[in-house]
């Protein structure tokens, strides 16, 4: 009986470790700026600089720029990792949760 309890506890610990490591892996991909090599950032910076004629406009452009970059990063991320959408297991579930809005993963 003790052996079963120990094995069950070890299994739970390994499952939690796998979830944590998969989540940190996905966070690293989400925050990686190397995925944005298509030059999209330069256009966004030019637009925010062009609208800085008034002092208030430049402050409003910063959140809009961040939102646009996040959308581009999400689409690029999902395009690269769409193969995980149909997989079973923790990575498939994380991918469906992460990018169901843009890459068509069905939950």
From Swiss-Prot:
| Source organism, top-level taxon | Eukaryota
Give the UniProt subcellular location, in the record's own words: Cytoplasm, Stress granule; Secreted
Q: Region Disordered: list its residue ranges.
A: 37-62
Q: Where is the composition biased (Low complexity)?
A: 47-61
Q: What does this protein do?
A: Cationic peptide with probable antimicrobial activity against coral pathogens. Shows in vitro activity against Gram-positive bacteria and the filamentous fungus F.oxysporum (MIC=1.25 uM). Gram-positive bacteria tested are B.megaterium (MIC=20 uM), S.aureus (MIC=5 uM), M. luteus (MIC=1.25 uM), B.stationis (MIC=10 uM), M.maritypicum (MIC=20 uM). Has no or little effect against Gram-negative bacteria (the coral pathogen V.coralliilyticus (MIC>20 uM), V.aesturianus (MIC>20 uM), V.shiloi (MIC>20 uM), and E.coli (MIC=10 uM)). Has no hemolytic activity against sheep erythrocytes.
Which Gene Ontology CC terms are recorded? cytoplasmic stress granule; extracellular region
- What is this protein's name? Antimicrobial peptide damicornin
Q: Spell out the family assignment given in the record's similarity comment.
A: Belongs to the coral AMP family.
